[in-house]
Structures are given as C-alpha cells and as structure tokens.
Amino acid sequence: ELCHKYNVTVISDEIHCDITNPGKEYIPFASVNDVCRDISITCIAGSKVFNLGGLQSACVVVPNKFLKHKVERGLNTDEVAEPNAFAMSANIAGFKYGDEWVCKLNNYIYENKKIFCDYVNKNLPKLYIIPSEATYLLWVDVRKYTDDATTLCEYLRSKTGLYVCEGSEYGVNGKAFFRI
C-alpha cells in the first residue's frame, strides 16, 4: 500500500520460489491483493529449482498492461529477451513435468538444512541461524564470535576448505553474517 501510495513499482525476485520446506507454500507477491498485482514485476526462473542456470533464461511476469509495455520495450531495446530454443524447452519441461523432482529436491534440501542446523546448535552454539522456510541458503549470525564475518569466512576457507559468502556482500548491515 505504501509503494502504491508513492507510485513505486515493486520488482519481486522470486527465483527461489519453488524451493520451500515441506508443508510450506510459496505465495507470489502479485497474488496478495489487487494493489500488489498492479504495482509488481515478478522475476522467476527454473535456474534454481531445476539447476538450469547455465541456460541463462528467466521469465518476467507483469500483470499491469502499462508496466508490461515498459518492461517489454526495455527488454527488447537492450536485446536481452532472446532465450535460445533449448533453454525454453528445458524450462517448459521442468515446470510441466517436474513436480516429483521438486518434491524430492525440497525434502533433500530440508534434511540437509536440518543436519547443518543440528550440527551448529550442538557444536557452535554461539552461531545463530536465521529461521528459514524456503530456499537452500542459510543466513548465519556470527556476532557472538566476531563483528567481522569476512575474517571468519577467510579462516573457514583456509582451515576447512568451506566456502561461505560474507554477509557484507549484501550490504553493510550484513557484516556480522555469512550465507551458506
């Protein structure tokens, strides 16, 4: 409502939308109400859920006709709306026939996240894992160990071979976090 009031368009990156914990449901931003639908541009892709990132394809969903015209013009002006036939076929196949795959993938990811969380809670109790109901990524608060996750990430890489993303890559407020 605030975005609508001030004529702000919401670009909703929902690329991880199909990766949810078992029993959890993805709710598209544009489906929340008519206002959300009318001010939204939603970006989705099969790249995460079907491991198709190398095919470099995505979808842009724009329900509002005025916004859709602007998006189409922008994409076509810059010649970035030209997916190859293989990418289109792979995405269509994934979304049309991939329900069983998605269910098994989500269970597998959920179990892996549980293993990680159980290990951390038992062995590194000062780390705090931000609760998550979706995606395969975890956001970890390291403030009880250090204020600088970058140093911790470098240590983890050199001593264990584990590569994690420094939270500072996502803005100054992320400097005491890492993403795995």
Describe each region flagged by the PLM.
Residues 34, 38-110, 117-119:
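Conserved core segment of the aminotransferase class I/II
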Residues 1-6, 16-52:
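Active-site pre-lysine segment of PLP-dependent enzymes
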Residues 85, 92, 108-117, 128-142, ...:
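Conserved glycine-rich beta-strand-loop-beta hairpin in the small C-terminal domain of fold type I
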Residues 13:
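Glycine-centered flexible beta-alpha turn that most often forms the glycine-rich phosphate-binding loop
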Residues 4, 121, 157-158:
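Anion (oxyanion) recognition and catalysis
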